[in-house]
A protein has these predicted regions:
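Polytopic membrane enzymes that build or remodel cell-surface glycoconjugates and lipids
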Residues: 1-339
């Protein structure tokens, strides 16, 4: 089949599988961030999202909270202006972005595997795996599909650069990465991937890439810390948020193994878990660590550029999701095994 046929199939399959979810209503933080948030009801309020958080309190009349998600809130406002408070269109936007992400995954693997069948299969796993359910179906977590969309767009642009990295292409890549950061701070993963790729495979691009990415990150820091004065928040009800660095590191093998286990056998999924490993033993530390090392070594032996990028992505991603990250909330989250 031709490339366009595979892309069309991904789009059709995605719409077919997620069609019923379009008719779900607003739940949880959807109401707080959209329905009960007057800032999302007027397009003129979009600049306020770059100077504050995602919630609203009438007492202070400004965006409040611990999350810095200006692009997601701007998207909510745009949808609200076009369609009102009908949740169908919010779900539709989130699902279409997720389908686009699956197409990006297909294009990424196709770039290195030089075939269509296997990349198509891998993109379907990304598209349909239940572990992605919260990121795709919970409107308040639209930031997950957004940061991945812009990060992947930037990465694919960099990977498709041939001999010359023009100023225009560099600017577009940097802009997409900035949008990824404005979607969620986890967009820093794609900055790391871009640097790793350039450092290892395209050293001739290193200086312009480092300069542009540093400038991008500085702009983000200015908006987040200088303008919005947003620090990283914590979830006080989560034991992991109160744990020491050593305790977090002790939990890392068990958490990573739990993600892998859930990916292979996604049964009885829950939004968040709050267990912790308090005592080191074979079952909760040494065995998971051994399995992870074996898998990593196997991946190293079967080295490929796509495998390296995927491995680096997961290493960086788990560094943000697992215990050593200072803002860690729950021990295990459905959000973001892939995204």
């Amino acid at each position: 089949m031709r490339l366009k046929t595979y892309i069309l199939l991904i789009f059709i399959i995605g719409l077919f599988v997620y069609f019923n979810t379009l008719f779900n209503g607003f739940v949880g933080d959807d109401n707080l961030q959209i329905v009960e948030n007057p800032n999302t009801h007027e397009a003129a309020n979009i600049p306020r999202f770059f100077a504050g958080s995602t919630y609203y309190t009438y007492q202070v009349d400004k965006p409040m909270g611990v999350y810095y998600r200006p692009l997601m809130m701007s998207l909510f406002t745009a949808i609200y202006q076009l369609t009102g408070s009908d949740p169908l269109f919010f779900h539709l936007a989130q699902i279409i972005i997720h389908i686009a992400n699956a197409i990006f995954v297909f294009l990424l693997f196709r770039l290195f595997l030089k075939k269509n069948a296997l990349p198509f299969f891998l993109s379907l796993i990304f598209l349909l795996h239940p572990i992605n359910a919260e990121a795709v179906l919970y409107i308040a977590n639209t930031q997950e599909v957004l940061f991945f969309f812009f990060g992947m767009a930037a990465l694919l642009l960099l990977l498709h650069t041939n001999k010359i990295l023009t100023l225009k292409r560099t600017a577009v890549i940097s802009f997409f990465l900035l949008l990824s950061l404005f979607s969620k701070e986890t967009g820093v993963l794609f900055i790391a991937l871009a640097i790793f790729y350039t450092l290892i495979f395209r050293k001739e691009f290193l200086k312009p890439v480092l300069f542009s990415l540093a400038l991008t990150f500085i702009i983000y820091l200015f908006f987040r810390y200088g303008l919005a004065k947003m620090q990283f928040g914590q979830i006080p009800i989560a034991p992991l948020a109160q744990a020491s660095l050593v305790e977090r590191i002790i939990n890392m093998p068990a958490i990573i193994f739990h993600y892998l286990q859930t990916f292979i056998f996604p049964k009885d999924l829950i939004v968040a878990d709050f267990w912790m490993v308090k005592n080191i033993n074979v079952a909760n530390f040494y065995l998971p660590l051994l399995i992870i090392l074996v898998l990593f070594f196997a991946r190293y032996m079967a080295f490929s550029l796509s495998g390296l990028l995927l491995g680096l992505y997961f290493i960086c991603r788990f560094c943000l999701l697992t215990p050593q990250w200072p803002t860690a909330g729950s021990t295990f989250q459905l959000l973001g095994f892939w995204v």
